[in-house]
Every structure is written in structure tokens, then in C-alpha cells.
């Protein structure tokens, strides 16, 4: 099977690209994945409860509901959505070749590929994590920190770098107190961020401390069991939120070694757009965004990728017509 455009990934960036390409009558194919990276089709937002910062929803919207709306809109404008995971992708020449997990014997081709597979937060994998994920445990303070379950409550952040510092400072807007759990006896954060943390009246840093277990009432988390790695003392910290700030992993395994990536595995794009060092291969959303990682910025990135793909195909079609005339 040959397609003009294939989109790999089904988060806001993938579906926004599909909407634009569908409206351009390019009949895009979107592979939404089958539990790719352990996440259901729709990406990270399917694990989020209330989304309060996506424009157009003054009362907020459930993450799965938002992604279902994205999916319906993609289909409405002509995108073909396939629930399968692309397992191999050859970018050595165009048209690009790929195959899926359901049948790795059969290869398909595409003139243009948009990779929108996102990134996933690193987890601690402690007892209670699965029970209280999005019920007290989160990997995004900016996304979830203002939620009612966290407002006016003591909260904890895990990490020691700039991301942990930023998340802790952000949470002070809503929390009565923020505990920062740092595994070592010093911060990895930049000096200016460390200074802000150390002098903030709402923030207490617990040095040499790791989280062992999250506890609660089987509905919401209300406590974290912690351990001092130097003294071996184990205690319970009464907090209603535990935020992970220990980094993200971009889902770029499919193309590593083929396309230019940075040291952390994020795809390098040109001039803030979706173009990569390979003509016809575009990256959108969190696979190339290690800074913002928001649903709305991801959607905007997908828009750029869709428009760039449409423009490239139109230019190539025009050149072909000139050569044939």
C-alpha cells in the first residue's frame, strides 16, 4: 500500500496534522498505535482527568473526551485511522518504507511521514503508583497543579534539577506547602533556581530522600512513604500530591540512528518548525519539544507539520508537471 502522507502517533499533534491534511484532500493515514509505549491511542491526555488549560473549554474537559473529539474531527475530514503500531521505518530513501506490528512481513510506502509519537514521563515504579496515577500522582505540575484535589493542600515534588525547581515554584501558587524530595545532598538545578528554592517560605527541601510508596484511601492519595538514604530512616509524609520531575523519554526509538537527534533523543527540527534533516520526514509535538510539552503547543506543532507536508507535496507535484510538459 502506498500513501502520500502517513502520520505516526495519535496525540494532539498527530490529529491536528491529520485534520489539516484531510481538509487538503490528501487522504492521510494515521497510525494511532496499539498501546505504543504502554499508552493507549490518544497519547498522554488519555491518562489525564480534567484538562483546564486547553482553549475553548471554560469548564475544562476530560482528557479522554478531548482526544475522542480530536479523533472524530480527523475522521470527519478524511483521515484514515488505523489502530496498529508502526514497528519499522526506513528513512534511507523516498518513498519511505514501513511496516506494522500486526504484520511485519508486509512493507508499505509513503511520500511523506510525520512522526508524532510524543514523549512519556519517567516513573518511579513504586508501590501504589498505578493506583494513584492521576489521583494524586502526576508528571506535570503545569498541567495538573491547579486541580481542586491539589489546591490548598501540602504537595511533594521528586527531583533535583531545573524542572523540579520550576514545578516546585509553580505549585506554591496553590499548595499550603511544597516538599522537594532530593536523592542527593545537593541540587542539580542552576544556581539561580536553587537560590529561589532555598529562600521560598513555602518550600522545604528534604535532602537524601527518596519516595518508597504512595498511600491513600484507594480513591485519592494522601501520604507518601519516604526514606532517608543516609540514615535509612523511613517515615510518612502527609501530602495530597506527588509530582514527578525526573525527566521525559521521547518516543523516538523508531528513527534513532536515521534522523538527527539531540543527546536526549529528541528530534532536532529546523528554525522552530517541523522540518528535520531528512526531506519529507517531519516531527511534531513532544518528540521534538523538550521545553513546553503542553497539549496546545503540541497541536500547534501538528498544524505546522500538516501545512509543511501539504506544501512540500504541492511543490513536488508542480515540479513533476513541469518536467512532464
Curated annotation (Swiss-Prot):
EC number of this enzyme: 1.8.1.9
UniProt record, GO biological process: removal of superoxide radicals
Main location: cytoplasm
Catalysis: reaction(s): [thioredoxin]-dithiol + NADP(+) = [thioredoxin]-disulfide + NADPH + H(+)
UniProt cross-references to Gene3D superfamilies, sorted A to Z: FAD/NAD(P)-binding domain
Keywords linked to the UniProt accession: Cytoplasm, Disulfide bond, FAD, Flavoprotein, NADP, Oxidoreductase, Redox-active center
Signal peptide region: none
Enzyme's top EC category: oxidoreductase
Entry keyword Disulfide bond: yes
Domain of life: Eukaryota
GO MF term list: thioredoxin-disulfide reductase (NADPH) activity
Record note on cofactor: Binds 1 FAD per subunit.
Binding-site positions, FAD: 10-13, 39-40, 44, 53, 86, 143, 286, 293-295
Cofactor: FAD
Miscellaneous comment in the UniProt entry for this protein: The active site is a redox-active disulfide bond.
Subunit structure: Homodimer.
Family: Belongs to the class-II pyridine nucleotide-disulfide oxidoreductase family.
PANTHER family, A to Z: THIOREDOXIN REDUCTASE 1-RELATED-RELATED
Protein name in the entry: Thioredoxin reductase
Organism (species): Pneumocystis carinii
Gene (name only): TRR1
Amino acid at each position: 500500500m502506498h500513501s502520500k502522507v502517513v502520520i505516526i502517533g495519535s496525540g494532539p499533534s498527530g490529529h491536528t496534522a491529520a485534520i489539516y491534511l484531510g481538509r487538503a484532500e490528501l487522504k492521510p493515514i494515521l497510525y494511532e498505535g496499539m498501546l505504543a509505549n504502554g499508552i493507549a491511542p490518544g497519547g498522554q491526555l488519555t491518562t489525564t482527568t480534567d484538562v483546564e488549560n486547553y482553549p475553548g473549554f471554560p469548564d475544562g474537559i476530560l482528557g479522554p473526551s478531548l482526544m475522542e473529539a480530536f479523533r472524530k474531527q480527523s475522521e470527519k475530514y478524511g483521515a484514515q485511522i488505523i489502530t496498529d503500531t508502526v514497528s519499522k521505518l526506513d528513512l534511507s530513501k523516498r518513498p519511505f518504507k514501513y511496516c506494522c506490528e500486526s504484520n511485519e512481513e508486509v512493507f508499505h510506502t509513503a511520500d511523506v511521514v510525520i512522526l508524532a509519537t510524543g514523549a512519556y514521563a519517567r516513573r518511579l515504579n513504586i508501590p501504589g503508583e498505578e493506583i494513584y496515577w492521576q489521583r494524586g500522582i502526576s508528571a506535570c505540575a503545569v498541567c495538573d497543579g491547579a486541580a481542586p484535589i491539589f489546591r490548598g493542600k501540602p504537595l511533594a515534588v521528586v527531583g533535583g534539577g531545573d524542572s523540579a525547581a520550576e514545578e516546585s515554584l509553580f505549585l506554591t501558587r496553590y499548595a499550603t506547602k511544597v516538599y522537594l524530595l532530593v536523592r542527593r545532598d545537593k541540587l542539580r538545578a542552576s544556581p539561580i533556581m536553587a537560590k529561589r528554592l532555598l529562600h521560598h517560605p513555602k518550600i522545604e527541601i528534604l535532602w537524601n530522600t527518596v519516595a518508597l510508596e504512595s498511600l491513600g484511601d484507594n480513591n485519592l492519595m494522601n501520604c507518601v512513604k519516604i526514606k532517608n538514604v543516609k540514615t535509612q530512616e523511613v517515615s510518612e509524609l502527609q501530602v495530597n500530591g506527588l509530582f514527578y520531575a525526573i525527566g521525559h523519554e521521547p518516543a523516538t526509538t523508531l528513527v534513532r540512528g536515521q534522523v538527527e537527534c539531540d543527546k536526549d533523543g529528541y528530534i532536532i527540527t529546523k528554525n522552530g518548525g517541523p522540518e528535520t534533516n531528512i526531506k519529507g520526514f517531519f516531527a511534531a509535538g513532544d518528540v521534538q519539544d523538550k521545553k513546553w510539552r503542553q497539549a496546545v503547543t503540541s497541536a500547534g506543532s501538528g498544524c505546522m507539520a500538516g501545512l509543511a507536508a501539504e506544501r512540500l507535496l504541492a511543490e513536488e507535484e508542480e515540479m513533476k508537471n513541469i518536467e512532464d510538459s
